[in-house]
Design a protein with these regions (language model features):
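Canonical radical SAM enzyme core domain
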Residues: 1-31, 38, 42-64, 83-90
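Short, surface-exposed linear patches
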Residues: 3, 29-31, 60-66, 99-101, ...
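Short C-terminal domain-edge/linker segments immediately following a structured domain
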Residues: 10-13, 38-41, 67-75, 108-111, ...
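Short linear functional motifs in flexible/disordered or boundary regions
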Residues: 11, 18-20, 74, 107, ...
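Short, conserved loop/helix-junction motifs that constitute active-site signature segments
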Residues: 26-33, 69-73
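Short, flexible loop/turn motifs enriched in small residues
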Residues: 33-34, 144
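Radical SAM enzyme [4Fe-4S]-AdoMet core and its adjacent flexible, acidic
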Residues: 43, 47-163
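Accessory C-terminal segments flanking Radical SAM cores
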Residues: 118-217
Length: 217
């Protein structure tokens, strides 16, 4: 209603495919069109490696869910992983073949439509982000997702949702910004300064700043 866009994360499996959820999604698509983007976690374009991560009989169900979303005109994105050491070019080619076969409206060469996540190993040392990084990398702090976006999560069993800086930090309580977007805009102290996020987490350096990744749709 205010001109914002929303990126909804899902595995597109049975919970999303319930009639009540499908009906709600169709209503949201009708109201918001392409400003609503559904990003589906498909760890690998092939069944074997996807199910190595997600478990047996998960691949077909996810494909079925993406097929439904594509058939009903949703703006789509895919989240894959680079865990197996396959090159980015090979991964994008593989997802591209799958998208063409299924008729999914996804440009696999667009890093926002096919996000390939590196492994987030917190035991690995990463360089600290300094002000000099922005000049060296020819980047601006405003380009990082948490400069202009927030993630809202309703955890199982929780009474209220929680606002977080981004999709990479769903479980770290130090990065919880409040229960509403208004509270998040005022978050101060710890990892925040008047609603702004301090880039102190290892994922900030490895993926967003030095890695050049983006979760934004």
């Amino acid at each position: 209603a205010r001109g914002h866009s929303a990126l909804v994360l899902t595995n597109a499996m049975q919970p999303m495919q319930r009639p009540r959820i499908k009906s709600g999604l169709l209503g949201l698509r009708e109201a918001h069109g392409k400003r609503l983007v559904i990003r589906v976690s498909l760890d690998h374009y092939g069944r074997v490696l996807h199910e190595e991560e997600r478990g047996p009989d998960t691949y077909d169900k996810t494909i079925e869910g993406i097929d439904w979303l594509a058939r009903h005109g949703f703006a789509l994105a895919i989240a894959g992983r680079t865990y197996w050491g396959e090159s980015e070019e090979s991964l994008r080619d593989g997802y591209g073949r799958l998208a063409r076969e299924r008729g999914w409206p996804i440009d696999v060469n667009d890093p926002a439509q096919l996000v390939l996540f590196p492994e987030m190993d917190l035991s690995v040392d990463v360089p600290e982000i300094t002000t000099a990084c922005w000049t060296i990398l020819h980047k601006s702090p405003s380009e990082v997702m948490c400069a202009s976006s927030r993630m809202v999560v309703k955890r199982k069993g929780a009474a209220n949702p929680v606002v977080l800086p981004c999709t990479l930090l769903p479980y770290d309580p130090a990065f919880e910004m409040g229960a509403t977007l208004a509270e998040a805009a005022r978050a101060d102290g710890g990892m925040f300064a008047s609603g702004a996020v301090k880039l102190c987490h290892p994922h900030c350096a490895k993926f967003c700043v030095l890695g050049g990744g983006s979760c934004s749709a």
